[in-house]
Amino acid sequence: MSDTVPLQIDVDTLRTLRQSGADVALLDVREPWEFDLCAIEGSSSIPLATLPQRAGELPKDRQIVVICHHGGRSAQATAWLRHNGYDKATNLMGGVDAWARRIDPTMKVY
């Protein structure tokens, strides 16, 4: 992968990254109750409201794919992360809803 990380990717690209063994961190910024309902395997939960306080838990040297329900909150989080030095933050377009519908039909949708 080049040093330039796209601002957003779709779920098919995320699946390809994971299948290729890429070192990608998955950050889910939904509320805890949403994360408990369904989550992409391997995701870490840091709700959007707590991101400024907890950003130090995130790696700056790895690509971070930011996830929410449909892509709105994760786009906000991605913009905040990039503004604060996390140049490898990437928004997952469509969020867990798109992941459930295209990649993992066994995942609960809400």
Where are these regions (language model features)?
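Short, surface-exposed ligand- or partner-binding patches at beta-edge/loop junctions that are enriched
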Residues: I67
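Rhodanese-like catalytic fold shared by cysteine-dependent sulfurtransferases
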Residues: M1-A25, P32-Q63, G72-Y110
